[in-house]
């Protein structure tokens, strides 16, 4: 079996601190959720469940080209959501208030780069989000989603794309950044 990889944009350290502080009392109030660790927060642009060593090399080259052609952009999180929906939540997430179109374009480019590299991309349509928590059994998080809707987090400049390996563990995945690709700062892109 190959490496379990994804491409992503990482939130700024300031946002991680702000959101972590906001969520602290919510974590204590909802123990039925398995809350994700702030150091693992990311906005996935493409997921690849099994990539060979050769595939990683080809993917790395293709992603470097994508990043060089993609201008850095402003991102701001806000609003809550749940998969499949708030009344039967399996995944609780924070949405994107600013930069959604640019993030979606980067996701499409990341996915296309993987396909060009001969790597199978998993997942259905792209829904920009940052996963906050998961539930073993579906629970009603309508109240939490409403609370998340009140967040108007500080924004940041998304200036890199990362290629991450996900190591599966019983007590939450461990993420290892394999490569960082700077997005273009050339305003002509």
Feature names for model-found ranges:
Residues 1-189:
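Histidine-dependent nucleotide/RNA phosphoesterase domain, centered on the 2H-phosphoesterase fold
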């Amino acid at each position: 079996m190959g490496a379990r990889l994804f491409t992503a944009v990482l939130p700024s350290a300031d946002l991680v601190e702000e959101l972590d502080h906001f969520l602290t009392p919510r974590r204590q109030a909802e123990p039925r959720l398995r809350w994700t660790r702030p150091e693992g927060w990311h906005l996935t642009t493409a997921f690849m469940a099994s990539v060979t060593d050769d595939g990683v090399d080809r993917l790395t080259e293709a992603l470097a080209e994508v990043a060089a052609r993609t201008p850095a952009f402003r991102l701001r999180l806000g609003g809550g959501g749940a998969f499949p929906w708030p009344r039967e939540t399996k995944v609780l997430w924070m949405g994107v208030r600013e930069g959604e179109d640019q993030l979606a374009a980067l996701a499409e480019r990341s996915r296309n780069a993987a396909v060009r590299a001969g790597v199978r991309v998993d997942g259905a349509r792209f829904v920009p989000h940052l996963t906050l928590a998961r539930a073993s059994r579906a629970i009603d998080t309508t109240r939490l989603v409403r609370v998340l809707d009140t967040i108007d987090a500080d924004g940041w400049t998304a200036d890199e794309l990362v290629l991450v390996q996900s190591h599966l563990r019983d007590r939450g995945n461990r993420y290892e950044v394999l490569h960082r690709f700077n997005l273009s700062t050339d305003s002509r892109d």
